[in-house]
Amino acid sequence: MKIAILLSGGVDSSVALYTMIQKGYKNIKCYYLKIWLEDELSYIGECPWKEDITYVDSVCKKFNVPYKIINLQEEYYNRVVTYAIEELKMGNTPSPDIFCNQRIKFGAFFEKINEKYDLIVTGHYAKIENKNNSYTLKQAKDKIKDQSYFLSHLSKKQISKLHFPLGDLLKSEIRQIAHEIDLPNKNRKDSQGICFLGKIKYNEFIKYHLGELKGNIIEQETGKILGTHNGYWFFTIGQRKGIKLSHGPWFVTEKDIQNNIIYISNSTNYLKQGKEQFLVHKTNWINKPLKNNNLSAKIRHGEKKIKCKIETLKDEIIRVNLEEKDYGISPGQFCIFYKEDECLGGAKILKTLI
């Protein structure tokens, strides 16, 4: 069996490689995907992939496994960056990680290697089960690190080629393995950036592509101007972090993109504005549910799932009814559907209702 393993330079993908070697697989080649555009790097002033490559090289030497760097800069820009920029301009909150997985890691990369491999292995926290050639995507054992949310827009064809060996391990167990086998990157911190952005903060990415534009911050209930901000594209509905005003905490409740205004409420009023019904569209079903009840939804990456029912309307729009209110439902983000621990697929949030 020919196996391709995606290495990021981090601990997770390195332990995934070790796990496959321990299982006896020998025909293995590793790949590092380079996506950074040089003008972005010159603006931000740091080259995040050089350190990655150092670790990839040392890990592959340790296990005597070949590796190759694949350049996907053009594909990354055309398939992910342009999507994120357009969503931000429309006042939406994009989810670049979802499309990095669908369009880059398991899209453009699959195209580059021309399906020469029997299996593609990564360090994602998720599980893939195959029963009678019927594939399901499931949550990882580590519910805090679980990445099924970001994998929800993969196709069955993509999933059929994937293997996630870390799905049955906790992060603490992976760190322990890394120390036991003395991985060169055993003490490397996890990446906190979006997608492949590594060390680069999301706001720096947005600032580079959209710049800054002063606008007013207005209290929702009184219409009073409380301060200024640097552009509506830096904010999302429900956001608390970054609103540097006294008498808080404050939360973003609305965005006026025509006039570049951010509306906010304090915690008391904000808690009255939760939503339990909203519309989604552009649905990707990995496995479409047979019944529309007894489902759960994730509105954002994290542990929390909310029980829900769904109803298909005209034009393939779905109405989602949550069993409890959520306070940060934002158009452009994604709602991911689950049946117990199985990730069924996901859809783009169109608008909130009640």
Curated annotation (Swiss-Prot):
Residue positions of the active site: C100, C195
CDD domains hit by this protein: MnmA_TRMU-like
GO molecular function: ATP binding; tRNA binding; tRNA-uridine 2-sulfurtransferase activity
Keywords, alphabetical: ATP-binding, Cytoplasm, Disulfide bond, Nucleotide-binding, RNA-binding, Transferase, tRNA processing, tRNA-binding
Annotated region (Interaction with tRNA), positions in chain: 145-147
EC number: 2.8.1.13
EC category: transferase
Gene Ontology process terms (BP): tRNA modification
UniProt key word Cell cycle: no
GO cellular component, one term: cytoplasm
Binding site for ATP: L6, L7, S8, G9, G10, V11, D12, S13, L33, G123
Keyword Methyltransferase: no
Catalysed transformations (reactions): S-sulfanyl-L-cysteinyl-[protein] + uridine(34) in tRNA + AH2 + ATP = 2-thiouridine(34) in tRNA + L-cysteinyl-[protein] + A + AMP + diphosphate + H(+)
Localization (cell): Cytoplasm
Disulfide bonds: C100-C195
Chief localization: cytoplasm
Organism superkingdom: Bacteria
Interaction with tRNA, annotated site positions: H124, Q333
Family statement drawn from the similarity comment of this UniProt entry: Belongs to the MnmA/TRMU family.
Biological role stated in the UniProt entry: Catalyzes the 2-thiolation of uridine at the wobble position (U34) of tRNA, leading to the formation of s(2)U34.
Protein name as annotated: tRNA-specific 2-thiouridylase MnmA
